[in-house]
Amino acid sequence: MTGSDSSSLAGPAPEGGGGGLHGGGAAASNGVANLSVSDLSGGESRAHLTSRITSADAVPIGDADPGADHGYHGELAAILIGDEALKAKIAVLAKAVAADHDQDTPPLLICVLKGAVMFVTDFARALPIPSELEFMAVTSYGSATTSSGVVRILKDLDRDITGRRVVIVEDIIDSGLTLSWLLRNLATRGPASVDVVALLRKPEAIKVDVDVRYVGFDIPNEFVVGYGLDYGERYRDLPFVGLLGEHMYR
């Protein structure tokens, strides 16, 4: 475990929160802004970027090309979002984020480990402006398939983010509990702004209203794996987002 003294925090994720944080807030005695919940209002949403995917869009794994299961024989039910669709969407998201940032002040991309590793790699390469990378690992899952609402930092940031324009890079938002907690945690560190770009979101699973500025796909409330997403540390290596067979987790 690395990072600051807050690298081993646990507790219920607070209700509420927003998907963006921009300036403002009361000044603390050390000159760093202490941003309250009311400051987490976020910027203008980019709802037009989001594509809606339904279960009907899934391609049964048996109908896909031979070898599409990448050796996970009988474990995957379907391909929900193929690799080409992922690449195209990431290009769109990168263009939108770049348009909202000044090239002279590179955004600091905070990748939420481990699930967002594939996404942040392709996203950073697709950005037409310079960026910097940081990594943070938080968990509220354990071995369960749904969020517990209890958040723990496994790896903290390796640098001070005071005055930085931060973009949190998330693989998936389901309950919103973990992201809400993370936004509040980062707000205490004095960034100039915080936005969130998420590849996937499950609207039906949301428990906390988190205003995420950039979302690639809204997907059904089913257990998905691939492209960084795992179940029991498996399936991260898949180049697509797929549906895990129910017999694998029930």
Task: Place the predicted regions along the sequence by residue.
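PRPP-associated nucleotide enzymes
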Residues: M1-R250
